[in-house]
Amino acid sequence: YVVVLPIPRGSVHPLLLWDTGGGHARPDPYHYVRIVRGEATGRSPGHDLLVVGGEDHKTGQDADAEGHYDALEAWTRERFPVAGPALHRWSGQILEPVDALAHIGLDPGSNHPVYVATGDSGNGMTHGTIAGVLLTDLLVGRENPWERLYDPGRVTLGASGVYARENANVAGRYADWLRKGDVASLDDLARGAGAILVRGLRRLAVYRDLEGGLHACSAVCPHLGCVVHWNGVESSWDCPCHGSRFDELGRVVNGPANRDLAPATLDESARAVVLPEGPIPAPEGPIPANPGAT
């Protein structure tokens, strides 16, 4: 999560800072702060902008986004009391490797020579630069001392406990198949909101647009079959297992899923849900070696 607040120009020296909380080793919320000079934006005369991020959690596993924004703003005001009313806020998604190092190199799960750069843990600028050097060397056959360090196929024994916990967390999310829906009736669904509706053995992701129209699709993530959750702040369907995300109409936005949620139709007069005939599409592949999108 990120919030942006104005501060009097020059009241805080130019900086980029972060704390050492959070991550796999510690449960403390992780925070990072930077200053954007007002003249760089052209929209804040007499002010600089304080950009503060933090309050991370795994994608699809926390429904209280507003609470995280509130906590982040409170943390900011406690340390920067000169900050004015919040101007902007947004949330994003990053990939966290279990051993805290990015995956840069030949993809061990591909049948073709595919090179990847992922698992940035929020440090995309740094890892992007490293990847530019390392991948160039790998492609031209030049030795690079970082190759083994960032090898996507590496096995890090010291991170085995984290790996086991993350996979146990993923397995636990399949219990969503046993839970009740978010609403008992479509009449309970407000405009601009989405909810999981249970009809027999089916889980449906239903969204009511601002004009009152209803849109439905399967709530089953096409990657490995978890039930997606509604993200009311970003108006998206988020998979709590491996971090796939879909827009309010079920169109894929972020992998590992590479296709949309299966369509469904609504018979509004009977409040019934009809899914296409045939079995649910098979999962797209094995569980990745390093789950844990946040």
What label would you give each PLM region?
Residues 91-95, 151-191:
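Mid-to-C-terminal Rossmann-like scaffold of FAD/NAD(P)H-dependent oxidoreductases
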Residues 10, 56-59:
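A short, flexible beta-alpha/helix-coil linker loop
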Residues 31-35, 104-106, 196-197, 205:
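Short, surface-exposed beta-strand/loop micro-motifs that present aromatic residues
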